[in-house]
Amino acid sequence: MLAIRTVIAISAAVIALLGCGSGTGRDAPSDASAAGSPAPTQSASSANWTLGGVPCALIPVPAAAPLGIGTCPGVRPGAIVLSDVGQCTLNFLFLGSDGYSYIGTAGHCILGTSPFGGDAGEMAWDPGTGPVARDAGGNPIGEFAYAILQDPKDFSLIRLDPSVQASAGMCHFGGPTAVNDDNPGITEPVVLNWFGNGVGVGAVLPARSAVAAGMPSPDHVFAQGAAAPGDSGSGVISSDGRAVGVLVTVGVHTASVGSGGLDAGMIGMTRLTPQVERAKAVLGVDLVLQVAPAQ
């Protein structure tokens, strides 16, 4: 047992030092390249963002896939969302004190990424003024109300149209049953689950898991797992069904794994609570996470 814990501790130390910027990587595309061409292979030193101060590459946002696809139907955690930037994945559902329902995805799914890298700032939109969000079939589901891409936050909220029937339950895994704000140390591994829509792998491996060697930071988590373009925004839950955060970055890339360039290695997640608290302050709206039984 001591030997196992020592290996975990060493692995965690490597993650802390290298984070999602280790190894060889591809940058996420700029808004222009998101419309089609795959990003070139580059060294991770050209990562286009930082998470917790560690150089990272945001998960690429691919151009919208053919309408009607999707392995997680409806408007719920794990379903496809289409924006002006491209295709991403929805995370958690919230009820606002203003009477609207809101559902999340990643901030870079609407703010895009700068060709020069770095933060893209923070924006909020009044009802009726935000960019339109659509489901996998191209149907409008609402408008973006809030978005931030500013280390260590990468989060956005869609203000759902009152006619949209949304579900709180994550495809395959169920939940979230509550919020997970735990901060286990680096010798306490945590299994994390999400349902994504990675292009090339989403139809085959939409439900995936990763292992984090602890979650000591209240703002972000690094874990050993795999992600692909289109997974951006996926809600991440712990094995007991509680909401941990949002999948946003990749680091070590192995394009030969699977098809469509599955990114295997260190992945990065932003913790949920700090981002929701910031959104509440900016919007002036209280937001309550909607829960569902774990499966």
Model regions and ranges:
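Serine endopeptidase catalytic core focused on the charge-relay Asp
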Residues: 82-213, 238-239
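Short beta->alpha transition motifs characteristic of CBS
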Residues: 106-111, 197, 229, 245-254
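Catalytic nucleophile loop of clan PA
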Residues: 225-247, 256
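Protease-domain processing segments flanking chymotrypsin-fold serine proteases, especially trypsin-like
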Residues: 20-104, 113-135, 140-146, 289-295
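Hydrophobic helical h-region of N-terminal Sec-dependent signal peptides
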Residues: 9-14
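Bacterial N-terminal signal peptides that target proteins for export
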Residues: 1-8
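C-terminal cap/linker of serine protease catalytic domains
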Residues: 160-177, 248-295
